[in-house]
Amino acid sequence: MNYFPWLTLIVVFPIAAGSLIFFLPHRGNKVTRGYTIYICVLELLLTTYAFCYNFQLDDPLIQLAEDYKWITFFEFDWRLGIDGLSIGPILLTGFITTLATLAARPVTLNSRLFHFLMLAMYSGQIGSFSSRDLLLFFIMWELELIPVYLLLSVWGGKKRLYSATKFILYTAGGSVFLLIGVLGIGLYGSNEPTLNLETLVNRSYPVALEIIFYIGFFIAFAVKLPIIPFHTWLPDTHGEAHYSTCMLLAGILLKMGAYGLIRINMELLPHAHSIFSPWFMIVGTVQIIYAASTSPGQRNLKKRIAYSSVSHMGFIILGIGSITDTGLNGAVLQIISHGLISAALFFLAGTSYDRIRFAYLDEMGGLAIPIPKIFTLFSILSMASLALPGMSGFVAELIVFFGIITSQKFFLMPKIVITFVMAIGMILTPIYSLSMLRQMFYGYKLFNAPNSYFFDSGPRELFVLISILLPVIGIGIYPDFVLSLSADKAEAIISNFFL
C-alpha cells in the first residue's frame, strides 16, 4: 500500500500554488507567466514520477488509493485512486495545460487572474479523472466549469458574453442531471448511503431504475462530449475563446464527457448500457456524417475545426457502444489522440489570427509563402486529423473499426451499414480539412495585399507544435504505448457484460 498521498498532492497543488499568483510582486506579466509555467512543469514532473514508480500496468484494480474522512455527517470521504482508464487522461491534462500556458503568452489583460483560472481548471480536471467518490467527482466536475466561464467571458472575442452564457446554460443544465443521478444512485437501496465507486460497481438495480439513472448520467456527459443535439454550444465557444482556452476545451474538457460515459455509464450501469448500445452505434454514425458534412459550410476557421471535433467524437461513441475491449481501447486511444491533434489545430488557428487578424476563411489566402513554417505544421497536423496512416488518429479509428467488426452484440447487416457510414465519414473528413488548407494557404489574396509581411513561427510556437506532433507520430507508430495502460482495465469492464 502506498502511504504518501501522491494524488492529493497532484490534485491540490495547481490551485494552491495558483492562489499565490496574487501575492507575487508587481513586475509585469513576465513574472506571472514564468511562475505559472514553472508550476505546470513541476506538476507534470510530479505526476509522471508518481505514476512511473507506483503504478503497475498489469493490475486492473485501483492504485495509489487514498481515503480520508471529510464530512462524517453523511459519510462523504476524500477518496482518490487511479487505474488504466484514468492515467492516460491525467497525463494528457498535464501535457496540454503546460503547453496551453506557454501558448497564453500574448494575454496581457488581467494576466494574474487568467493564469490562476488555468491552474484552477487544471486541479478540477485532474480531480475529476482521479475521483473514486461520486459526490467528489461531481464537485470536481463543477469546479472546472467556473474558470472556463470566466476565461470565455473576459478574454474572448466580440460575442464572448453570448458564447459564455450559452456554455454555462448547457453545462449547468447537464450538471443538474448529473447531481440527480449521483444522489439517486448513492441513496438507493440501503440504510447507509454510499458514494464509493468500488462499492457501487458491485451493486445491482431494477432494470427500470437503472435505465433512469443511465439516462440522467448520459445527458450530463452528452452535453460535455458533446453528442448531437447537445453540441451547439461548442462551435460558438471555440469561435470566441482565446486559443489557449480552446486548447484546454478541445484537448481536455470534451474528453471528460467520454471518460464519464466509460467510468459511470459503462462500469456502474452495465445492464442499461447493454440495452442502449445499439443507440450509441446509431448516434455515433450520424454524428460522424452530420458534423463532417456541416464543417465545410463554416466560414470561421475555429468553428470549422470545432465541427471536426464533433465528428471525431463520433468514433469515441462507436467504441463505447461496441461493448468489446478492442472498441473500448480504441475509444481511449481516440481520447488521447484527438486531445493532442485538436489542441495543436486550435493553437495554429490562433497564431494565424494573431498575424493576419482575419477569422474567416474566405478572407484568407496565399499564406503559404509568407509563413512557411506555420503552413508546413498546419498541413501535417491536418493530415493527422484526417487519420493519415502513421499518425495516432489512424490507429485509433482503425481499432474502433475492428471493435465494431468483432462485436458479438450486433448482427452482420448492422455491422456492414455502420462500417459503410464510417467510411463515408472518413471520405468527408479530407474534404473539409483539405479545403481549409486550400482557402488559407493557396492563392494570392493576402500575399498580394499591401502590408502583407507576416512573421513566421518563433521558437515558442515551434516548441509547442513539435511537442504535440512528436507524441502524435509516436502513438501512430507504436500505439501500445497508450494501449498498454488501458488494456487490462478495458477487459475488466467488458467482462461485466457477459457474467
UniProtKB/Swiss-Prot annotation:
Its main location: plastid. It is an enzyme of class 7 (translocase). It comes from Citrus sinensis. One of its GO terms (biological process) is ATP synthesis coupled electron transport. GO terms for molecular function: NADH dehydrogenase (ubiquinone) activity; quinone binding. The gene is ndhD. Belongs to the complex I subunit 4 family. The chain crosses the membrane at residues 4-24, 35-55, 84-104, 111-129, 134-154, 167-187, 208-228, 242-262, 272-292, 305-325, 330-350, 386-406, 416-436, 462-482. Disulfide bonds: none annotated. It is found in: Plastid, Chloroplast thylakoid membrane. It is a multi-pass membrane protein. This is NAD(P)H-quinone oxidoreductase chain 4, chloroplastic. It comes from the Eukaryota. Keywords: Chloroplast, Membrane, NAD, NADP, Plastid, Plastoquinone, Quinone, Thylakoid, Translocase, Transmembrane, Transmembrane helix. Its EC number is 7.1.1.-. It catalyses: a plastoquinone + NADH + (n+1) H(+)(in) = a plastoquinol + NAD(+) + n H(+)(out); a plastoquinone + NADPH + (n+1) H(+)(in) = a plastoquinol + NADP(+) + n H(+)(out). One of its GO terms (cellular component) is chloroplast thylakoid membrane.
